[in-house]
């Protein structure tokens, strides 16, 4: 009996610290995933999470010692566990609230990350840290040997941390998801509190509240989602999400564009990795993939099939492009995360019968495996093309940009093959870009760099680096195969000299590859970009509520935070001033949008802005100036349509400008083009009917209206269909007259 009593005397305290330490470590690992939607995943986020939680545990140990000396240990433990379970819920709520605070985005990026993590995770860390000292005091009060008891408490606490680490990293995140894990930890802590104080009725009350909140937060029913979003237990529902999952590496989401159901986006954490049109996968959406395509076309020398390797799968857009254009090719995709591949198959169009060969492992390990097989006398592929697509602008894998890795890639690259890398940097700072170029030149004798021509030297841009063993005329190849559609900037010797100077001729090696530090300017620029997006989202919300003056202020704050958004923001400000009747201010805002576009490196289309400006000038009675703006918009749209004749929105915009100038025939022809390309767009039907009616072409208008009504019926928009039916009758009456 004495042995059993002694066993329970030490078992209960050690089991308690095991569970509390297990929960702390689960919280630490989950913390980095929970904040990834707002802050991404980088060295900064991991540093902040580890530092803040260790600080919380330290403070908790200090406070817990005082609690142990002052209050009854068993009841204290029950209360601490109960409060800890409450803070788990608060963690979810705070993360959603803090992530939306605009003022945080004005801080430097490291301080922003630290502040966000501290506000969300410091309190639960402190509370869980208080438990171990109180448990130790409880064990000692039972008369157990001091040294052995303290040693057992420390050992089982460490064992709990180890178990929590492996369980979370290897199983729980992939199987349960971040939010479910947090609620599970909260439930465990609540159960522990009840076990320690069974007769405490407030704990039973809190258990009922906890279960109710967990139901609201976890049940997929619409009422639960709406209620949870109101109290920040969930993010607001996003109707654009088609697929969502959480893997060991990323939060994965596939979204559909609001303005085009055929346009899909593939997200990994905050990074929009891929974009595609489901009805035309050959129409590549990113400039870097189009550069990849034309270089591949130019260097393949009419080969029937290729041997290619892609480092990083994402949405598998470019590998599928190769599969389609060069059928029978060997395409090896090295994607570390099998859940990314699963998402691409289930929601992003990657077929299960694809000929693409996916290897789920780190690219460095795969290349090492190939080289071992080669040294062992086995035949391994010699790739014609290797594409690097595993780099984001926050935390690129350092092991894939070192000199040692480049040497290994060179060994599996054919003599006339090329290695292409897509990476993000700011040209003016150029630390990461310059270092990668410097490093590649140590392995490959010929290295070239190209990017989109419409970029700013002072903000983030995607660069494509092409490295090979033989000389190529990159500009000639691209110009021959891309048909003049791409406006590109080829970095020359002076540009490369600038990058070499900025990067201090740094060579990245396995021993020294500080990629996160090299990307600090990019991270800061990214923070300003995200901050401006918060202002823009707020401005749009205010605009929808009719609070136009406040919306204008929010747009102007976005411009001040991140001038790159000036074109978009000034255009919206002009629209708001127009709606408020302040036409002179509207003209000024539209002119500022055009001026910024002309002066900055970010050349964007101004046809829409010029159309808006022309409309306001007409209202002011300045018809000649208005016509000039409409004509400039028409010229720009025609240039774009020469290269991209299948852009229905451009044909629609062209029609709007012709209509504004009174050229109804040209407007109708343009609207018909838009409608032919996108027959399910109700706006195109509406505008075509209106311009045909204005032109007195009632018979044609009636035919279009009948199709419009059928479209509404097919979409189950019966009320709108009935309204259009009355409109149709009025058109038929006009035809009879």
Predicted regions and their residues:
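Short coil turns that delineate tetratricopeptide repeat
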Residues: 563-564, 598, 604, 638, ...
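Conserved alpha-helical positions within TPR/SEL1-like repeat arrays
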Residues: 536-540, 567-579, 604-618, 648-659, ...
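Alpha-helical transmembrane segments of multi-pass membrane proteins
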Residues: 1-244, 256-261, 270-273, 297-306, ...
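Soluble small-group transferase modules, centered on the S-adenosyl donor enzyme superfamily
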Residues: 202-300, 448-544
